[in-house]
Regions:
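The two-metal-ion catalytic cores of nucleic-acid processing enzymes
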Residues: 1-263, 268-285
């Protein structure tokens, strides 16, 4: 079977590379979708889909599932083969996942908003993550349950000393390395479902991961990933639209949580002369 599979992929790759006209492309689609027959193996058919179409969205469409709503899984198995920080891991066929419209309450997920403060070692230029002395000196965060306006916790990780602040959990660290690890451990305990902030895709996420890389802290910083064996990564995402233009965003990706940059929403929904945080807050708050 291994030999036949190799031949099949080689055949498809050659035909894809030699396609130059619409007529040729049409023929190749028909060619692929017809059944294949290899020596000593049964014939198989292959259905084609858009390669760039997200598979999660495809499941939503096929099963009639609304994003962020409850679902019911009829037949599943407990998956003990993967080491995670989840309460339960299951395996099932996607056809066993069905919408549960009778449940209308919000899930008790956790939303965390964060912001970093950085230091310029030359006191003049804007902080550069590549410079040794341009450290992260503070990471502040506030977390909520989806269904409640009252914060679960207000948190501040600070480099060096800081006075106590009423209603805020303040953790003090002697080095930037300890601060970054402390921040990751805080996320590991809280396990937020959505992580947000203002311009985090344009500054905060990238700055944090560059400092993590500078201190060789990849393993330690990945301690909050839901799937323990997977590292936290910085992903590059390109987005082009008439409202936002062409942009490249740098996003910290971790299993089990979704990141959302509030700046993108503000730029898409409101027309302001300036999108600096202070100016936007003046307009909206």
């Amino acid at each position: 079977m291994k030999k036949a599979t190799k031949y099949f992929y080689k055949r498809i790759r050659i035909k894809k590379e030699t396609s130059s006209t619409e007529e040729e492309a049409k023929y190749e689609i028909e060619f692929i979708e017809r059944s294949f027959s290899f020596d000593d193996y049964k014939s198989r058919t292959f259905q084609l889909f858009e390669a760039d179409f997200d598979q999660t969205l495809r499941v939503f469409h096929l099963q009639g599932i609304e994003p962020c709503n409850w679902v019911r899984v009829k037949d599943y198995e407990i998956d003990s083969g993967v080491d995670t920080r989840n309460q339960i891991n299951i395996m099932c066929d996607y056809r066993e996942i069905h919408p549960a419209p009778e449940y209308t309450s919000l899930a008790p997920g956790i939303l965390l908003s964060y912001d970093i403060e950085t230091f310029s070692s030359d006191y003049v230029s804007f902080p550069q993550a590549e410079k040794d002395g341009d450290e992260i000196v503070q990471i502040g965060a506030v977390a909520y349950h989806f269904s409640s306006p009252e914060p679960i916790i207000k948190y501040l990780a600070v480099l060096d000393t800081c006075d106590d602040i009423d209603g805020v959990v303040v953790e003090r660290f002697e080095s930037e390395e300890e601060l970054l690890i402390g921040w990751a451990e805080f996320l590991s305990k809280l396990q937020p479902d959505i992580i947000t902030g203002y311009n985090i895709f344009g500054f905060d996420d990238d700055y944090i991961m560059k400092r993590v890389t500078k201190h060789y802290l990849w393993n330690e910083f990945s301690c909050y990933n839901r799937i323990i064996s997977e590292p936290v990564r910085l992903s590059m995402k390109k987005l082009g639209s008439s409202a936002l233009g062409d942009n490249i965003f740098k996003v910290i990706t971790s299993s089990g949580s979704t990141s959302f940059d509030l700046l993108l929403h503000i730029r898409n929904e409101f027309k302001f002369a300036s999108y600096k945080l202070d100016d936007v807050a003046y307009e909206l708050v």
